[in-house]
Amino acid sequence: MKKKFFLSAILISLFGLAAAKPVQADTTVADIQKRGELVVGVKQDVPNFGYKDPKTGTYSGIETDLAKMVADELKVKVRYVPVTAQTRGPLLDNEQVDMDIATFTITDERKKLYNFTSPYYTDASGFLVNKSAKIKNIEDLNGKTIGVAQGSITQRLITELGTKKGLKFKFVELGSYPELITSLHAHRIDAFSVDRSILSGYISKRTELLDDSFKPSDYGIVTKKSNTDLNNYLDNLVTKWSKDGSLQKLYDRYKLKPSSHTAD
């Protein structure tokens, strides 16, 4: 069953761009309400954030729940469009989703291309390794191969960290988290690196999460750069939910503990 799910996840990632239906360019809040449907790009392979059950087809996670909360505020239905780190930007650019809520890290470079709301979650990056490899810290990864997701900033962050510590790494980029965890289990890579909360969903009897973490970063809801109307509306919602405890309820629901700060 797991193999079928992994294959399904890969196929949906490849064909997601073609399958998604276009939405109106620079969709306003009023447009969405008139349409009666909010179209949101979400992950489908990240437990606790955006995960699609292969048996029932239902989504769960703080990000899919957050999308539903936005839809409830607008009094419309929500439609989830599965995305990856590779496809979430193009789908937004091509007006096939209204927004992305998909572990999209806020960076200065990305803010030149897209609008981001205030952060709804802060997480640090880490490493998942096979227990049998006896890897205990980042120094043990010197010269080894680290798997990262295509389209993510993880490789750059690890390289910067390695430069500071005098370490060098090899990298393999893969299109989805199921591909990465499969490669780790098969010992084709020595470690799988992404945000720690994402990695926590893939811990098993065979794997463990290293204590080492690096570069805490913020996730934001993403809209097109030109769509200030929708971004302002969403930012107000995130700010409100941060203050009234709604975001904390989401963290508690999925047993998540955000990092308390963002690294310099």
Residue ranges with predicted function:
Residues V42-V46, V81-Q86, E95-T107, G151-S152, ...:
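Beta->alpha turn/N-cap motifs
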Residues T122-V129, R196-T239, K257-D264:
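Periplasmic-binding protein-like
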Residues K68, D72, K77-D140, T207, ...:
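Acidic, polar ligand-binding/catalytic clefts
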Residues A25-A102:
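Extracytoplasmic small-molecule ligand-binding "clamshell" domains
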Residues T64-E73, I135, E139-D140, K144, ...:
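Extended ligand-binding regions for polar small-molecule ligands
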Residues F104-K112, L157-G162, T182-K215:
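A ligand-binding cleft/hinge motif common to bilobed small-molecule-binding domains
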Residues D26-T28, T154-V172, S204-S213, T239-D264:
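Ligand-binding clefts/hinges and TM-proximal coupling segments of bilobed small-molecule sensing domains
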